Each structure stands twice: as C-alpha cells, then as structure tokens.
C-alpha cells in the first residue's frame, strides 16, 4: 500500500496513494458497521447496513494546528428509520473507534435513506 500526504512531492509521484485520513475513514466506517450489526443482533433486528465515514481536516484554534472531524453516514435497508437511529446511537456508544475518539474529535451521526 502506498501512503502519501496530499500536496507533497510523494503524492505527485504516487497519484493513487492513500493518505492517513482515508485510512482512518475506512477503519472507522468498518468498525462502526460491525458495532451496528452487533447491537442489531442483540436486539434481534436484521437488516443490511452501509456506513460511510467522511473525514474533514479543520484548523485547530487552540494551537493553530489542525484537527479532524468525522461524519458517519448510515444507511439501513429493511429497518425503519426511527429504529435505525436508535441502533446507530447505541452503536456509537459501543464502537471502539467511537470510544477512542470521544471527547477528542467531533463526530456527527447521520441516518440517510
């Protein structure tokens, strides 16, 4: 796997390289989907889910550096939206990535159709 920071000479040499934010998004979305399905099984709810994580790179006003924020978009097929919203919030409490980032980065949960 090629890794390169956007805007660097290495990124120009390896235009298909991934970056740390993409890796974080991939890991978080996969982990969250697993947590969501775990919670659903506990509640005897079966449905197809898809989780997409979008990572934003933001200015950190505290130290003038940078920070990230994440939006998790969750789609569920075969489950009512209201029930999915409840499951998503429970999954957010359970997910290891959510636990690790809680209080450190802004995470937005979106249930989409």
Predicted feature locations:
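Extended beta-strand/beta-hairpin segments
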Residues: 1-26, 33-113
């Amino acid at each position: 796997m090629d890794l390169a920071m956007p805007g660097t000479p290495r990124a120009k040499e390896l235009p298909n390289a991934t970056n740390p934010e993409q890796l974080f998004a991939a890991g978080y979305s996969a982990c969250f989907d697993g947590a969501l399905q775990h919670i659903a099984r506990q509640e005897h709810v079966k449905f197809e889910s898809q989780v997409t994580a979008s990572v934003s790179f933001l200015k950190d006003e505290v130290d003038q550096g940078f920070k990230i924020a994440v939006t998790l978009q969750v789609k569920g097929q075969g489950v009512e939206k209201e029930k999915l919203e409840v499951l998503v919030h429970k999954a957010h409490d359970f997910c290891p990535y959510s636990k690790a980032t809680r209080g450190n980065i802004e995470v937005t949960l979106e249930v989409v159709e």
